[in-house]
Amino acid sequence: MITFSIITCTFQAEKEIQRTLESVAQQTYPHVEHVLVDGASRDQTTTLIEAYIAAQRTQPEALHRTVYRSEPDKGLYDAMNKGLQRATGDYVLFLNAGDTFPQTDTLEQVAGAVGEGEMLPGVLYGDTDVVDNTGRFLRHRRLVPPENLSWRDFKWGMLVCHQAFYARTDLAQCTPYRLQFGLSADVDWCIRVMKMAEQKGLVLRPIHAVVVNYLDGGMSIKHHRSSLKARFHVMRTHYGLLTTCAVHLWFLIRSFLRK
């Protein structure tokens, strides 16, 4: 049976963290560790996490292991790197505070995509629904994952949501987030993981199901302009300046035609 490390990084997340903790705890798949990395929050985030862990210890039927640390960091992706270092599962998934699994058997569905005794795929990936801060469905994510994903596909945008991207932990730990890419460090990371999977001859496998409810209004949306600049830098790094400019020109033309 494959194992999962679910990494949740928090900072001042008292309004969102409880939903995510409960969603992970409700997963019926047993082979899960939840790695919680807090950036020394000053609100009630750490209190809520510590209460959750204490409650788990009183429940002998609790299915999952929880790993937790709170300390200052250099931002979200530095915290994610700390989480990667602590991950011990076969696959790692980043689930931000406020994000949830759509079903209690979501991880069972993901695990079921890997055959018994099969060489583990490099990446497992699925679809995404966008929800509001009450968990109400808003829309299906506009970008739809392709059937046969390649790192080259990301030149057209982040076709798989970061929170729907299950990377083999050994690949992920060899490709830590590069902080110089700012709010688009997740795009760069996904591309590099897929490149490494290709180099090792590992498949990228679709799940054909919604695997995450993504909380609307993430950091890249709140800081849209700086995120776009960082993303252009990522695209240029992986696909070259000419291809990146051509793709962005097409984005502009398409946007104009839709008006």
PLM region spans:
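N-proximal low-complexity "stem/linker" segments adjacent to membrane-targeting elements
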Residues: 1-26
